[in-house]
Amino acid sequence: MGNKEKEENKKVMRKNILTSMFLATAMGVSAQTQQVTVVELHPAPGQFVNTLPEATAETTHEEVCEAATESLADEELIHLGTYGGYITVQFDHPVQNKKGSDFRILGNGFYAASDPVYGSETIGGSFEPGIVYVGVGDDVNTCKWYELAGSEYYTSEIHDFSITYHKPTAESGDHKQPFSTFDNYIKWEATWTAKDGTKRDSTGYHMKNSFHKQTYWPLWEEGETLTFKGGKLPNNAIDQSGKGSYWVLYRYAKDAYGYADASLNKDQYSTFDIDWAVDEQGNHVELTEINYIKVVTGIFQYCGWLGETSTEVAGFVDLHLVPGYDDDPIIIPVKQRPTGVASVRADGKDDVRYYDLTGRRVVNPTRGIYISNGKKIMIK
């Protein structure tokens, strides 16, 4: 089949999908399915932008959402780009909040075949966590959004990260970095508040690598800048080679939960509980059902020749439509909001993880205040 015929078939398929959705709405059809519709797709710049799904200079936002809807129906990847890029989907019905996890998000995370430090016990590989939000309301533009508080929410997540990317003025340029075709390709400017209350800011560039030659700027977006604001997760990549040739992207812990593309698709940790919803102050919110699901790339990290860390999604599953699921639902233990400062001695040897007040992991904590298991800990 030629490219022209393939494109015509795609157009027919898109028309059929939209026609079916319209007829179902007009006739009041109430059948619930696992079909999701992409209502927003706004990736940040990234090396697979405009290819997952494909887009050209003539592509509109509506058309790229239709293409993404088709991709998800086939469990094909949607690329969200670097930090802040997002996708919003809805099922043909509200997702109910029942006992245990309520939905699953498919990604492309996997464990490393060879971890030089942790070997077969590794929790590292290629994991690119995305923060998940749920929306309640009839219109995606006016609905109320709530973040699902994952395992890092009360400890190491930054909650007011803001970044602006500038549209590149050229697609090639000066380059000295390995595998780069343009070192100063995408300019960015970021601001945030550190855990100790210090206001921070930074400016830099993302390079364009030699493996992906198309523009990394989403072609359907208007304007010269893209700005994203929200939560930011701690970086998770380690250059295990020490030379930039072997990067391992780790899960935050074996029982880390609450993030898309941050575990294997078959794991319980790729499922999400609406009960994790919190408001902007981090307070628990009671929701009976949700209308929209948004996934946002949660890490701002660049890994040499691997490029930017980007969340990818490949599907969404309403677990309550899976036969027999509600009889034995997945229940994930969650970390509670810190309520005070506990006291421990510094000479204890255990597997507890400690973080300083900026969210950085501390391997050998000395005297001071740290965050551990969702609580502030004072080591004497």
Go through each PLM region and give its residues.
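Tryptophan-centered short beta-strand motifs
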Residues: 141-148
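Beta-strand signatures of extracellular beta-sandwich domains
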Residues: 131-133, 353
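Short loop/turn segments immediately following beta-strands, especially the blade-tip
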Residues: 136-140
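Bacterial Sec-dependent N-terminal signal peptides
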Residues: 1-33
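C-terminal tail/sorting-segment detector
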Residues: 14-15, 369-380
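Residue-level detector of functionally pivotal "anchor" positions at catalytic/ligand-binding pockets or at interdomain
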Residues: 332-358
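A domain-level signal for the mature, folded cores of soluble proteins
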Residues: 32-128, 150-337
